[in-house]
Amino acid sequence: MGKKKGGKRLTKRDIADAIQALFQAHPGETLSFKQIFKALKFDTHPVKMLAIDVMEEMEWDDWLSRVSDNSYKLNLKTQVQEGTFIRKANGKNSFQPDDGGKPVFVAERNSMFALNGDRVKVAFMARRQNHIKEAIVTEILERKHDQAVGILQVEKDFAFLNAEGNFFTSDILIPKKKLKGGKTGEKAVVKIIQWPSAESKKIIGEVVDVLGKQGENNVEMHAILAQYGLPYKYPKKVEDAAQKINAEISAEEIARREDFRDVFTCTIDPKDAKDFDDALSIRKVGKHWEVGVHIADVSHYVTEGSIIDREAEQRATSVYLVDRTIPMLPERLCNFVCSLRPNEEKLSYSVIFELDDDANIKDWHLAHTVIKSDRRYAYEEVQEILEGKDGDYADELRTLDTLAKHLRERRFKNGAVKFDREELHFDIDDNGKPTRCYFKKSTDATQLIEEFMLLANRTVAEFIGKAGKAKKSEDPNKPSKSKGKTFVYRIHDQPDPQKLENLRTALAPFGYKVKTSGTKGAISKNLNKLMEESQGEREQKLVETLTLRAMMKAKYSTHNIGHYGLAFDYYTHFTSPIRRYPDTMVHRLLTRYQDGGRSVNQDHYEELCEHCSQMEQTAQYAERDSIKYKMVEFMADKVGLEFDAHISGVQSYGLYCEIDDNHCEGLVGMHDLDGDYYEFDERNYCLVGRRTHHKYQLGDAVRIKVARANIEKRQLDFILAD
């Protein structure tokens, strides 16, 4: 038998691996024995004969196709698909097709050095006996990330970046002249200037920004943003353009608008909010209530195609980290010019409703308006008033609350799904350090605002969506209706039947019955029943999490399919143009159609919708990472302390435990569970001791000790204290 360099004999497995790698590197080519032997340096007769035997076996397995007596090619399925490459730290990479379906395994040797999130083209390999379905990357269509964030290490002759996250497969080499003054131990942003190839697996980059010392709050928050390709600085040219915008409201502009300056109007927002997108007005008109949903008229100040607009389009959304907001618009616009600040005349785009006492819509119209907010409320203030405390304009607020409750009751009666999940919040000191960690619950005050925003969003979407189904309106304040107007919808598809089946299987051991087929209303009613029945039970978090996973993700599109979760046939985002670019798009389209304009190019707007949906998801990833960071930072000085907790999640690698007092969650790794060897019972969501049969189940009360708080990796590790 032949030998490798160094004298080690080639085994049949060695030969098979070498042949497999060669054909996967040339997926569309026919290779002759001569080419194969030369490429793999199979020089001896025994090795060549063994190689031919191996290829015949691969042919029997349908892994290779024989082209002639002495040539083969890789047996690829005829179809080629495009999609996203998902890189895993454990090497179990996968390909997610664009058109949905299950992820397909991609071995590292078949990845073409694709990185996490890259758009790729793959060919599916014929499945060998007893092997899982596999794909091979044949082309990298688009790199998701062209920059990395990490810790610099500067050596005598070279430097490299130890990249954070799972985006990159290896350290990034940096020429010394491309360091931009960076030093060992500093965090930096590096732009990739050379990607891996068949000739070289090295990734080479250049430093574009030195963030600063690892562990400093600003450095870490900027690092999270940069890791996801999100901006943490505003271009000076855009800031300068914002400074030049005239904030004065002329008499001529006021004359063109409906005047609500003398009607009671207020904003209700989080106590630390600065950008006030929306305001509500209310007054009695005859037997009915006139409620105005007034939205900052961003499109009046931000001209389509301007430098400010291009930057906003690229960002697509404001990003909300734990201790800061990275605004979509320059600060002068979002916090001052456009913001509906109290006691200041402001331009708004409004949906004016005429409602009866049960919140039924008797009439409505769309109008460009001028308002003057009488009061800026925090949610907490309004909640106290709704609970009976005296306060400014208490009667008006309580009337709005009553109307909102009617709207909410009707919405759930019509099939909306109740997802009132608690959100984790932090109190932060002046240095960015978390001083308190707690859950924030939905209240009547937050639901009041939510219901009127939903009403406005649904109403304008329904109006455009039903275009052509009614005669042209004679009301000049309503958009002209013509068939087929391109519009931006917020859509949410029905749950995938397979996901519902998975939910049914997972919850069956707990006694819950999941409906996997039926009408939309029947399924949503069943999902609401699940969450109601699980309230206060130890598996409550599991039920909520798995039910949420069964739902599809909401997104933006010009192709309307309705919004399943809200039970609306038509829905859009109209109410937050300061922080969401789709809302600005909607404002412009409504104004265009209101003025009798023709429909816009649908393909162009669909591309914008896809971009905004992607940026929304990216922003959510960054927000979650900031929460993880602050959670670990909050617990860093508590290592060694014990806390009462409960099991909040069970996985094959350990137990997630949530501390009862502060809701911080950490992992008790399988290797830290003493006294037995524990196995994961996936069906019943528990760990079972092989010898003792002791079980760790969701909701079980436990006493934990904080073992490690790794801020750099954003990981919190616990051990059981008893």
Predicted region positions:
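Charge-lined substrate channels and their catalytic hotspots, especially those that engage the 3′ end
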Residues: 2-292, 299-344, 376, 384, ...
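A short macromolecule-binding patch
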Residues: 102-107, 168-174, 663-680
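Electropositive polyanion-binding surfaces
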Residues: 38, 189, 194-196, 213, ...
